[in-house]
UniProtKB/Swiss-Prot annotation:
Acts as an adapter for the XPO1/CRM1-mediated export of the 60S ribosomal subunit. The modification Phosphothreonine is found at T433, T470. GO terms for biological process: positive regulation of protein binding; positive regulation of protein localization to nucleolus; positive regulation of RNA biosynthetic process; protein transport; ribosomal large subunit export from nucleus. Changing L480A: Reduces nuclear export. Disulfide bonds: none annotated. This is 60S ribosomal export protein NMD3. Keywords: Acetylation, Cytoplasm, Nucleus, Phosphoprotein, Protein transport, Transport. The modification N-acetylmethionine is found at M1. It comes from Homo sapiens. Transmembrane segments: none annotated. Its main location: cytoplasm. The gene is NMD3. A motif (Nuclear and nucleolar localization signal) lies at residues 405-422. Found in a 60S ribosomal subunit export complex with RAN and XPO1. Interacts with XPO1. Associates with pre-60S ribosomal particles.
């Protein structure tokens, strides 16, 4: 006799919903999902509309209690900021998922879709999906408020240089732009003999002072003034001032060193030419091609002044030029420049062509000069030199003429210049009419000195076509390989192409 095996598969039982009578699978609440949702709202207590503050000037969002952060639209950082606004109500439920719902970037609305779970009647777990609407409200942050107020600052750096030329400031401006040291400034003010940098915190100003000490030879003094105080909480409000003084020497200046300093630099001659000012003063002896670098501390220990300013440059024409092959070096002499060639030249002033008066001198420009060339230099023989070191020198050791640089046609150089530099956004007052000429001198220095160009970002000017390399004068030029493309990349919190989120 055989017995039929009973099937072990059993269909799950069904019960009726206690509210609507619909057959459902058994659950701890004995109620269907539709009726459970109609009776219990697990999102109760979570606000469906929240406000969030946004600064239009700096494109940042406010994160309580006092922080402003920059977030792109629909980014993880912005989602975290939105969830923190409803952190307390969300702590009572379990957050399963969160994500943005697309909105128009200019609608001043952010929508976040949330999926939450919570245990309800008799241990039943209910899941619900809903949207929280964030209203973006305009609010100016503290930093932008200080910028607009123009007088609310905590620290100021006053950079000064006692010279008649601004070549060092133009070079310093390019270094600040290259390394982004201007980003924390509230405003930059240009005055006749320097620049003023305003900051919202003393730490940012100290960082800028350290940068200046690394890039140009200078010294500084710090002071502070008490603005207000609270005797109950023992807090004080100060305004700090940093006075930075750059050495009063610029490129192409003729200087006279003290005998002690000249001896310490390798027994070089006291009359030297400044060929470059970077983190140190670079000098060259036009009689021997001996070079030396003087840092800021050495300069302030043994100060010296410029004998002539750029407005005293005179134009000479080269009558004869010969290269000195055998350079005699004294005992203990310093390093000799390999980029220059020592030459002996006879020159005559272009303003004295109707006379037969000529001047003889040695120059470090022997590799550039040929008979008939024009050259700029200082006439020391007919100049009143009011310098304590020159007055003590033997007159035979003071040259009649010191040649500085070869002269080219400035109009042609400007016309063929297919590059440009960026400038700091700053306030200007009491501008000198000579500033444009000084700026053109700085641009010419960049073309002539490769060592300075390495520290400067040079951008190609697309408005000026690239000409051929044929040059009848042989004036120095900047190659295309040394230029950068001028790109404008906007950091926009909306994620759109250059558009502001709020108008």
């Amino acid at each position: 006799m055989e017995y039929m095996a009973e099937s072990t598969d059993r269909s799950p039982g069904h019960i009726l919903c206690c509210e609507c009578g619909v057959p459902i699978s058994p659950n701890p609440a004995n109620i269907c999902v539709a009726c459970l949702r109609s009776k219990v709202d697990i999102s109760q207590g979570i606000p469906k509309q929240v406000s969030i503050s946004f600064c239009k000037q700096c494109q940042r969002y406010f994160q309580p209690p006092g922080t402003w952060i920059q977030c792109a639209l629909e980014s993880r950082e912005l989602l975290a900021l939105c969830l923190k606004k409803i952190k307390a109500p969300l702590s009572k439920v379990r957050l399963v998922d969160a994500g943005f719902v697309w909105t128009e970037p200019h609608s001043k609305r952010l929508k976040v879709k949330l999926t939450i779970q919570k245990e309800v009647m008799n241990g039943a777990i209910l899941q619900q999906v809903f949207v929280v609407d964030y209203v973006v409200q305009s609010q100016m942050c503290g930093d932008c408020h200080r910028v607009e107020a123009k007088d609310f600052w905590k620290a100021v750096i006053q950079v000064r240089q006692k010279t008649l030329h601004k070549k060092t400031f133009y070079y310093l401006e390019q270094l600040i732009l290259k390394y982004g040291m201007h980003q924390n400034t509230l405003r930059i003010k240009e005055i006749h003999d320097g620049l003023d940098f305003y900051y919202s915190s003393k730490q940012h100003a100290q960082k800028m002072v350290e940068f200046l000490q690394c890039t140009v030879p200078c010294r500084y003094k710090a002071s502070q003034r008490l603005i207000s105080q609270d005797i109950h909480s023992n807090t004080y409000n100060y305004k700090s001032t940093f006075s930075v003084e750059i050495v009063p020497i610029c490129k192409d200046n003729v200087v006279c060193l003290s005998p002690k300093l000249a001896q310490s630099l390798g027994n070089m001659n006291q009359i030297c030419v400044c060929i470059r000012v970077t983190s140190a003063i670079h000098l060259i002896d036009p009689n021997t091609l001996q070079v030396a670098d003087i840092d800021g501390s050495t300069f302030w220990s043994h100060p010296f002044n410029s004998l002539c300013h750029p407005k005293q440059l005179e134009e000479f024409i080269v009558m004869e030029c010969s290269i000195v092959q055998d350079i005699k070096r004294a005992a203990g002499a310093g390093m000799i420049s390999k980029k220059h060639t020592l030459g002996e030249v006879w020159v005559q002033k272009t303003s004295e062509m109707n006379t037969d008066k000529q001047y003889f001198c040695r120059t470090h420009l022997g590799h550039l000069l040929n008979p008939g060339d024009l050259v700029l230099g200082f006439d020391l023989a007919n100049c009143n030199l009011n310098d304590e070191h020159v007055n003590k020198m033997n007159s035979d050791r003071v040259p009649d003429v010191v040649l500085i640089k070869k002269s080219y046609d400035r109009t042609k150089r400007q016309r063929r210049r297919n590059w440009k530099l960026k400038e700091l956004a700053r306030e200007r007052e009491n501008m000198d009419t000579d500033d444009e000429r000084q700026y053109q001198d700085f641009l010419e220095d960049l073309e002539e000195d490769e060592a300075i160009r390495k520290n400067v970002n040079i951008y190609r000017d697309s408005a000026i076509p690239v000409e051929s390399d044929t040059d009848d004068e042989g004036a120095p030029r900047i190659s295309l390989a040394e230029m950068l493309e001028d790109l404008h990349i906007s950091q926009d919190a909306t994620g759109e192409e250059g558009a502001s989120m709020l108008t």
